[in-house]
Amino acid sequence: MTELKNDRYLRALLKEPVDYTPVWMMRQAGRYLPEYKATRAQAGDFMSLCKNAELASEVTLQPLRRFPLDAAILFSDILTIPDAMGLGLRFAAGEGPVFDNPITCKADVEKIGLPDPEGELQYVMNAVRQIRKDLNGDVPLIGFSGSPWTLATYMVEGGSSKAFTKIKKMMYAEPQTLHLLLDKLADSVIDYLNAQIKAGAQSVMVFDTWGGVLTPRDYNLFSLQYMHKIVDGLIRENDGRRVPVTLFTKNGGMWLEQIAATGCDAVGLDWTINIADAKARIGDKVALQGNMDPSMLYASPERIREEVAGILEGFGDAGTGHVFNLGHGIHLDVPPENAGVFVEAVHELSKPYHK
């Protein structure tokens, strides 16, 4: 076991004392960094970058060379599982992800198999192993997956969507077909995340990007129950340490209590909820991650520091159970120096709350 030089992120997720609030950023390895653009150009395209362990490790570590972040997150994509199921993923210029073989009926669902994490998805595990080696114990490595509901939206819609009409049509007209798909996806996510943990991920996160488009009843039926199944199926101890699990539903602020009741260790918050309210509701059960609006990074350094100070004050003096993050991924045109102001502000301004 490599001894971690900085385990504040893991300790905060387990509500253990830390000397300052740890911070990382969703999409911290990405297009706002010129060095990322150079490495992606070297790879040729996005999926080639994901599938090259050395280059995936390089881009994972790039933000850590610039900023004193408290965790690294695997460089990959949430759509690796549907791609491995044979849906024909490609990234079209200006369109984002497109599946050439989307799910349209029950027969399509029945014919897809569960990908082997050390087979079709071995490139992801190779990247995890390479990143752990290259990190050399500096900070923990976060593994991740999309949630079954979020993966299903892309698989049924055939790509990104604004209205989600195809998947909602399936949900209301053929609910059993959708449940069959979600159940297969939940099993795949369990296998995938457990393989990441065995390969070296020290914490895992499930991104439910599109759970917030559902009614409260449908959220529980079609999204949350499958995330609950995942939490129940995950390896929770590895290499002598607990492996914390974070669930994040974008626009899920009305369901915090239900998310916290799944048995996860932490709940991710987007910027539409006040962190003091979230703490009052679920802070006795789980750690909280979040939740500055990523667009705040367009503001002046003074305004960024002011926002960080306000969120820290909202979480308050308890001193445990908060991982600072953005409420969603960093935007591609944010000046890197503003991200630096953000990270430094979290470290500096949080220290008085941890005495």
UniProtKB/Swiss-Prot annotation:
Its EC number is 4.1.1.37. The lineage of its organism: Bacteria, Pseudomonadati, Pseudomonadota, Gammaproteobacteria, Vibrionales. The keyword Lyase applies. Substrate binds at residues 27-31, 46, 77, 154, 209, 328. Belongs to the uroporphyrinogen decarboxylase family. GO terms for molecular function: uroporphyrinogen decarboxylase activity. The record marks 77 as: Transition state stabilizer. Keywords: Cytoplasm, Decarboxylase, Lyase, Porphyrin biosynthesis. This is Uroporphyrinogen decarboxylase. It comes from Vibrio parahaemolyticus serotype O3:K6 (strain RIMD 2210633). Homodimer. Its main location: cytoplasm. Catalyzes the decarboxylation of four acetate groups of uroporphyrinogen-III to yield coproporphyrinogen-III. InterPro entries: UROD/MetE-like_sf (IPR038071), Uroporphyrinogen_deCO2ase_HemE (IPR006361), Uroporphyrinogen_deCOase (IPR000257). Pathway: Porphyrin-containing compound metabolism; protoporphyrin-IX biosynthesis; coproporphyrinogen-III from 5-aminolevulinate: step 4/4. It is found in: Cytoplasm. It catalyses: uroporphyrinogen III + 4 H(+) = coproporphyrinogen III + 4 CO2. The keyword Cytoplasm applies. PROSITE patterns: UROD_1, UROD_2. Transmembrane segments: none annotated. Signal peptide: none annotated. GO terms for biological process: protoporphyrinogen IX biosynthetic process from glutamate. One of its GO terms (cellular component) is cytosol.
